[in-house]
């Protein structure tokens, strides 16, 4: 009996240890979901959209961007150019050490951020227009989930962004605020706008022209051994996920360079060092070169897909996942295939032929 009691005490102690571990980070889930993120206002002028077209032209077969910047008009915002707008304008000291936005971060020790994928729903009735008018992004954290063994936990954060034009009365209310307006006065107007656009039901589009879900994974601090391009030859080879279909719709290879990555970072107002600083990539993150942006992969897949759609067919919903890194100065091959009526599969392959990004698309006919 003495031995049995000893075993029971050990099991109980183990359970207490497990509960203590679970409670060490479990507070992040409700805390992050309760965060009130400030609305992000932007003017939907054609400039950023035009600059992206010009930046991608050398990488897209037969692309012909306009020779001049067009004035604002009722032209719909191209898919997926919403990525170029609605980024917060923070002073540099307010950014995290790696250059990222602190609003989504769990905090220490989860300082390493990776874009895991996302989804986008486009309104069939109220698309955003490049008419120069003021619009807003209402953003919230839908979920924050802790996964992994003790000491190896990761935080998966799902961020919802609802993009919508402002009403004339809302634009007037903001314009009437003096430069010295109090935080309370500003917050009241922002709360009214948030209340009009946000929905508790994440399937309800409401007045949003674009509903985006961004899935970000935060990893714990680690100091990986510095990595060089040659060092990868001696490293264990990861499992390669091969595509499960032929690219019957399109297949196109590009060689991304640092200029493309810089331009996309600039257009998206993204200071994340993994896209800009090769030394940071090698010594802090353990990557052999600059990382190709997850949203840039998404952009190429959407641009190439839309060039292959039938007349009147428009993208309505996209869901995608980033499975493995893509790198600057290494070829990336974008592929697409039909998957039934109004359905398509898109993916990106690395130099090893493995799938690094994959997505599914549903279209509608207008």
Please place each PLM-identified region on the residue numbering.
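Hydrophobic/aromatic-lined pockets within catalytic cores
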Residues: 57-60, 146, 306-310
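Hydrophobic, proline/glycine-rich low-complexity stretches
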Residues: 4, 12-136, 315
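Catalytic strand-loop segment that frames the active site of acyl-thioester-processing enzymes
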Residues: 23-86, 207-292
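Acidic/His-leaning functional-site neighborhoods
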Residues: 252-333, 337-345
């Amino acid at each position: 009996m003495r031995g049995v009691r000893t075993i029971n005490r050990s099991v109980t102690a183990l359970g207490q240890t497990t509960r203590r571990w679970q409670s060490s980070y479990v507070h992040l889930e409700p805390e992050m979901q309760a965060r009130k993120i400030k609305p992000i206002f932007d003017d939907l002028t054609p400039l950023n959209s035009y600059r992206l077209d010009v930046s991608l032209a050398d990488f897209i077969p037969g692309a012909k961007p306009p020779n001049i910047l067009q004035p604002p008009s009722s032209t719909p915002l191209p898919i997926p150019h919403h990525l170029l707008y609605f980024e917060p304008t923070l002073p540099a000291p307010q950014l995290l050490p790696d250059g990222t936005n602190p609003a989504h971060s769990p905090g220490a020790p989860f300082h390493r951020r990776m874009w895991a994928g996302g989804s986008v729903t486009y309104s069939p009735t109220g698309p955003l227009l490049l008419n120069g008018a003021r619009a807003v992004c209402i953003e919230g954290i839908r979920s924050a989930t802790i996964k992994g063994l003790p000491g190896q936990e990761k935080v998966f954060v799902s961020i919802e962004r609802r993009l919508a034009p402002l009403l004339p009365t809302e634009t007037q209310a903001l314009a009437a605020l003096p430069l010295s307006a109090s935080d309370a006065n500003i917050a009241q107007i922002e709360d009214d706008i948030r209340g009009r656009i946000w929905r508790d039901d994440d399937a309800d589009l409401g007045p949003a022209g674009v509903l985006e879900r961004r899935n970000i994974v935060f990893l714990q601090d680690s100091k990986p051994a510095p990595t060089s391009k040659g060092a990868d030859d001696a490293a264990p080879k990861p499992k390669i996920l091969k595509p499960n279909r032929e690219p019957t719709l399109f297949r196109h290879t590009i060689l991304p360079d640092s200029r493309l990555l810089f331009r996309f970072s600039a257009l998206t107002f993204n200071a994340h060092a993994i896209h800009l600083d090769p030394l940071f990539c090698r010594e802090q993150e353990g990557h052999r070169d600059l990382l190709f942006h997850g949203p840039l992969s998404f952009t190429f897949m959407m641009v190439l897909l839309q060039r292959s759609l039938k007349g009147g067919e428009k993208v309505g919903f996209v869901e995608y996942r980033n499975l493995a890194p893509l790198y600057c100065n290494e070829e990336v091959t974008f592929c697409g295939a039909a998957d039934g009526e109004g359905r398509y599969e898109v993916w990106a392959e690395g130099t090893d032929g493995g799938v690094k990004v994959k997505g599914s698309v549903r279209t509608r006919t207008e």
